[in-house]
Amino acid sequence: MQNLNDIPPSQACTFFTETQVDIAKRVEKIITSDLRQHHPAWELAAQFSVSETSLKNYFRGVFGQNISIYLREVRMKKAAELLATTRLSVAEVAEQVGYMNQSKFASVFKKQFGLSPLEYRRSKNLEN
C-alpha cells in the first residue's frame, strides 16, 4: 500500500495530469477518512465530474490497485491495529472498519492475516 500524500502530483505518476492525480488523492482521502462509510465509485465520480471508468483508472494509476482492494487493505490494517491495541469486541472492530456482518469481516480478516480476529488478538497478548 503506497502513501502518496507527501509526493507532489507531478511526480506521483507520469501518465496522468496533475488534476487527475489530485482527484485520485482526494478520493483516497474521502474513502479512508471514515472507514464505516461506503462511497460507491459512481458517486465519487459524479462528485468530481468524471466518468466512473476514468476515476477508477486515475486511482489505480496513482495507488497501484483498484479502489476496493485498496480500501479493504486499509480496513484490515486498521482492524489489526484495533485488535492489538484496544479491548473492543470483534463485532465493534468490524463495525469501526465498515463491516456490518461480523462473519464476513472475520472471513476477510483471516484471508488477509492467516488468523481469525481472536487468534490475531491472542497473538498480540491482549486477550480479555
Model-inferred region functions:
Residues M1-C13:
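An amphipathic alpha-helical interaction segment
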Residues S10-H39, A45, R72-L88:
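A short, Lys/Arg-enriched amphipathic alpha-helix from helix-turn-helix/homeodomain DNA-binding modules
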Residues R26, H38-L71, Q96-E119:
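Basic/polar phosphate-binding segments, predominantly the helix-turn-helix DNA-binding elements
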Residues L71-A80, E119-N128:
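Short, basic, alpha-helical segments at the C-terminal edge of helix-turn-helix-like DNA-binding modules
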Residues L83, E95-Q96:
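Active-site pocket scaffolds in enzymes
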Residues L88-S89, K104:
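Residue-level recognition of oxygen-bearing side chains
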Residues V90-A94:
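Hydrophobic positions on the alpha-helical face of helix-turn-helix-like DNA-binding modules
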